[in-house]
Amino acid sequence: MRRIWLISTIFVFALVSLILIAPLTAGSEPHLARSIYGGFALLCHQLPERSYFIAGHKFAVCARCTGVYAGFAFTFLLYPLLRPLRAIDWPPPVWLVLAAVPMAIDFGLTFFGIWENTHTSRLLTGLLLGGVSVFYVMPGIAELATRKTRAKRPTFTLASSESMASAPSDYSAPDRRI
C-alpha cells in the first residue's frame, strides 16, 4: 500500500507542479505553457485578476484553485501520519460540506457585493477544501489497491451426451402449446 501511496503522491505533486511550470515556461516555451493553460482551462476560469503571477505570467489556475490543489497535495503527503494507509472508511460527508462552507461564504459575500474577497481568502478557503478532500479520495485509492478478491473467470466444461439429449416436443399437438 505504501508503494501505491508513493506513486499517487508523485502523480499529485507532478500535477500541482504544472500550475507553476505554465507561467515559468510561458516566455521560453509558449507551446508547452499553452498546453498546460489549456488543460487547466477545463477546470478553472483562470481570470487574471483572481490569479497569482510569477515572472509576469499568471498561474495555470486562479488563487482559489491553487489553494485546492496545494491543500490536496500537502495533505496527501501527510496522510500516512494522520491515518493508516489501509483505512478504507470515509469520514462522515458532513465534514466535506463543512470544509466547503467558508468557500461558499467567501464567494457569496462577494457575489452579493457585501465584501470583496482577496487572493488570501480565496487561497485559504481552497486550502481547507483541498486538504479535507484527501480524506475522501485516499480511502478509495486504498480500497482499489487492497482489493484481493477478483471475480474468477467462469470455467467451461463440455456437456455429456446425456445432458445434450433433446426433450420431447409439444409441437405435434397444436392445442397444447406453451
Where are these regions (language model features)?
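N-terminal signal-anchor transmembrane alpha helix
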Residues: 3-30
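Extracytosolic (periplasmic/ER-lumenal) interhelical loops and adjacent juxtamembrane/interface segments
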Residues: 27-61
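Small-polar-interrupted transmembrane alpha-helices in polytopic inner-membrane proteins
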Residues: 14-19, 75, 90-112
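Membrane-interfacial alpha-helical segments at the cytosolic side of multi-pass membrane proteins
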Residues: 67-85, 131-142
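Membrane-interface helix caps and helix-loop-helix hairpins in membrane proteins
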Residues: 58, 85-86, 111-121
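Short, highly charged, low-complexity non-transmembrane loops/tails of multi-pass membrane proteins
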Residues: 146-175
